[in-house]
Amino acid sequence: MLSTSPRVTIPDVTITDYVLRHAARLGDKAALIDGPTGRTLSYRQLADGARRTAAGLARRGFGKGDVLAIYCPNVPEYAIVFLGVAMAGGINTTVNPLYTADELAKQLRDSGARLLVTVPPFLEKAKEAAAQTDVEEIFVLGAAEGARPFTDLMQAGDQPPAVTIEPAEDLVALPYSSGTTGLPKGVMLTHRNLVANLCQAEGMRNFECFGERDITMAVLPFFHIYGMVVIMMLGLAGGGTILVMPRFDMMEFLTLVQKYRVTILPLVPPIVLGLVKHPAVAQFDLSSVRLTFSGAAPLGEEIARALSTKLGCPVVQGYGMTEASPVTHLSPTHDEPFKPGSAGKIVPNTEVKIVEVGAGGDAELPVGKEGELWIRGPQIMKGYLNRPEETADCLDRDGWYHTGDVGYVDDEGYFFIVDRTKELIKYKGMQVAPAELEALLLTHPAILDAAVVRKADEEAGEVPKAYVVLKADDASKATPADAIMGWVAQRVAPHKRIRHLEFIDQIPKSASGKILRRVLIDREKSS
């Protein structure tokens, strides 16, 4: 099935050129505002900062194909770093700011990062992680004793290096995703992937995209593809203002929406639920909001309708994944039926077909029939970094990306996601790979075997639940569940913590030794 929106022309330019296309004209207009402090970066400062960053990187020998890791919460300078690296021909690998030093080190090693940018509160963790890798230098946004400030990098002038970038071939972003299965993997995204996705959102029929008069809330993290592309890149490309929050706090969020007259709220379902239920919402003037957009995880129809009524504006969903840069579907904002609970319609220049799960064929199923979504378009990744087999498992020779998500399309072209075949857990829209937690659990001295599955949760959407087989000795058998969960919590980022644990005599497995997760998920649902 093809998109019903008109095809869009995708220019053969870099992501920096596309995002900063209006910067000279917009000049002193606020591009990004730091919500807690009010500190502002204008479009002129953003463009100048990106050029100076590129020049400074080049002077240090950082060039085409080199990787820089960004280990920061949301700050206005995030955009300067990202666009400066892109201008230098480099690749940004964006890291979850909640990662432990060990988790950070894994991504630094896997991505081959040469440089690391962080903030003062994260410096010690960054140093600990970098010491285990080939990272050559750490830069800090701000001041920290014994650290090189990022501003040092910007003293090499404002002439970026003359780098030849092939937008369709050269990588610019390397976010990490668990994909349909296994451990987090580097997703290779080119300049063209990102530019295409911005053009697709801007060209979507009956979707009022971000414009120059919009003020967009950026509370969702920039390290995540949703925050990186849908909020930061799309908002700046449209010439609007991005209001940046480093972390979510309901009262501060509401205060900032009211103070700055925010017009667009890109959210995830847990925040949508909070806005529906929190009594303080009624105390604030949120009438400036014209559009609320929910992504990263499914949003229930009743919750969407409730927030739409409360705010007096559309609450629409989209659908996508890191591997698609990320958007493949958007819900119309006007002149078409409002269907809460739908993932929306196909964006321009994109094909989608629904295929019978596990059938081994590629025949497209009819309208209303549930199956796995396959997607093809210019926004689809090049593949997973250094993982050709895992790339081949999900990206076929004809260019179709097999999402692992199960859904159907209705007779008006609206898609609905109902289940997924892939293993990953979505905690507040953030990915948790069961295999990663299982590998960690198996290093616990009392554990013989373990499996991790998703458990439904009203607030978080899903949380990790572990099924654990203890070793036979008396000491191991006496190990309480809370002790194991606490042990895991000390070793992983907060969103990966195991929230429920059940002891079991045996982990169900296939003849080849593969964990039968569906058996455990069904057991969980019936309990």
Segments predicted by a language model, with ranges:
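AMP-binding/adenylate-forming catalytic core of the ANL superfamily
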Residues: 99-102, 106, 116-118, 265, ...
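Conserved AMP-binding/adenylation subdomain of ANL enzymes
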Residues: 195-215, 223-264, 277-278
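A short helix-loop-beta submotif of the ANL/AMP-binding
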Residues: 66-67, 73-93, 97-101, 106-115, ...
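Adenylate-forming
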Residues: 73, 118-127, 220, 246-252, ...
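Conserved AMP-binding/adenylate-forming core of the ANL superfamily
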Residues: 31-75, 79-83, 100-105, 151
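Conserved adenylate-forming
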Residues: 57-62, 160-169, 174-218, 240
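Conserved AMP-binding/adenylate-forming
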Residues: 46, 240, 292, 299-316, ...
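ANL superfamily adenylate-forming
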Residues: 121-168, 183, 278
